[in-house]
Amino acid sequence: MKVVQGDYRGEGLKIAVVVPRFNDLVTSKLLEGALDGLKRHGVSDENITVVRIPGSMEAIYTLKRLLDLGVHDAIIVLGAVIRGETYHFNVVANEIGKAVAQFNMNSDVPIVFGVLTTDTLEQALNRAGAKSGNKGFEAAMVAIEMANLRKKLRRDFLEPHSNSRQ
């Protein structure tokens, strides 16, 4: 049996982090967590691209452009969509989730969903480092692991093996 899995070595990986300015009280903490996680695991500053966008819906356009560039080993999408009094929360939360899933199905680059969808600001802050850990840090760990898994899958299954059957 062959088991293939990623690891947490970030040396040499190129990671993009897409983060909205909307709900900056939360998203800035998510970004801090993501950058901390990436750097602690060896991703160098010059290999991290932070893309600031107005809000979470703009991540869809930004993801497409970053994927078209083809230079990143993984992309992290951060954000904080907090329920309000209107249906807007549902639209944004659903569309960004669907878009990330769709890009993951159609792209060779792993995209990590680090968008908080909460009922209250307090819940969002708790998940951005207050009580429930930092989901930005967790997203960074997933990005590193998936970028390495991508490389291992390519190496193990796409590159020709010298002792493979002809």
UniProtKB/Swiss-Prot annotation:
Keyword Cell inner membrane found: no
GO cellular component, as recorded: cytosol; riboflavin synthase complex
InterPro entries: LS, LS/RS, LS/RS_sf
Keywords: Riboflavin biosynthesis, Transferase
An individual GO BP term: riboflavin biosynthetic process
The EC number(s) this enzyme carries: 2.5.1.78
Class of this enzyme: transferase
CDD domains linked: Lumazine_synthase-I
Binding-site positions, 5-amino-6-(D-ribitylamino)uracil: F22, S56, M57, E58, A80, V81, I82, F113
UniProt key word Transferase: yes
Annotated metabolic or biological route of this protein: Cofactor biosynthesis; riboflavin biosynthesis; riboflavin from 2-hydroxy-3-oxobutyl phosphate and 5-amino-6-(D-ribitylamino)uracil: step 1/2
Gene3D superfamilies: Lumazine/riboflavin synthase
Family: Belongs to the DMRL synthase family.
Task performed by this protein: Catalyzes the formation of 6,7-dimethyl-8-ribityllumazine by condensation of 5-amino-6-(D-ribitylamino)uracil with 3,4-dihydroxy-2-butanone 4-phosphate. This is the penultimate step in the biosynthesis of riboflavin.
NCBIfam families assigned: lumazine-synth (TIGR00114)
UniProt name for this protein: 6,7-dimethyl-8-ribityllumazine synthase
Gene: ribH
